[in-house]
Amino acid sequence: MINEPFVPKFEKEEKPEKKSIYIYNTHQSETYSDGTTTYEIGMELAKMLEEEGYYVYFQTGNFLREAEEEGLKYNQLYTISRRHINDTFAEHGGFDLVIDLHRDSAPRSASILESDGVTYAKMMFVVGMKSSNAAHVMEHSRQLTDKINQVMPGIMRSVFQRQSVYNQDMAENMVLLELGTDQNSTEEVRHSLRILVEALTNGGIE
């Protein structure tokens, strides 16, 4: 279920001096072990980054409902997100970072990092190698992986390459982040959110 959305403060006429971030979820209904969705976690990430002083645009709407109304299947949701990305870029211009936030499916043993009594959800960037921007996205994903691992060593899995596009042809600074898996709890994901925000705040966004 998709709850009431976080309403971003980013307006077209307020083109910011500070860094701007666009967050959306192609698969908004992906859930963690206790039922929280990636859409809800995306809203939390947006709020956290806004509190750090970034301009954040969080993509609202219900992609799955739109797909159903148009007779599209779940595996065609990238068609829906692409349309929203186009509209957002047209309305707001470019962003310093674009994040498509997902969660992966993996065994529990590959999903967690334990450090000082805290359990974190592991994270991973995915690069669509069929995208015309694959080289740029790969470099950016590797740099972010290193930056996040500097904050919490071992929290990042290696960048994963797939023979797909994931709409990454639309911007060189667009990344697909798998934040945890279906085996992670919301608490574990929130621990990782704090690491992600710290890394982005301390030089993770060029």
What are these model-predicted stretches?
Residues 20-25, 57, 97-102, 124-126, ...:
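Soluble periplasmic/extracytoplasmic beta-strand elements of cell-envelope proteins
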Residues 28-36, 45, 67-76, 127-135, ...:
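Second-shell loop/turn segments in exported
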Residues 34-112:
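Catalytic-core regions of hydrolytic enzymes
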Residues 107-133, 141:
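A short, glycine/acidic-enriched catalytic loop
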Residues 133-160:
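Active-site-adjacent substrate-binding region
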Residues 158-206:
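Active-site-adjacent mobile loop/cap segments within catalytic or ligand-binding domains
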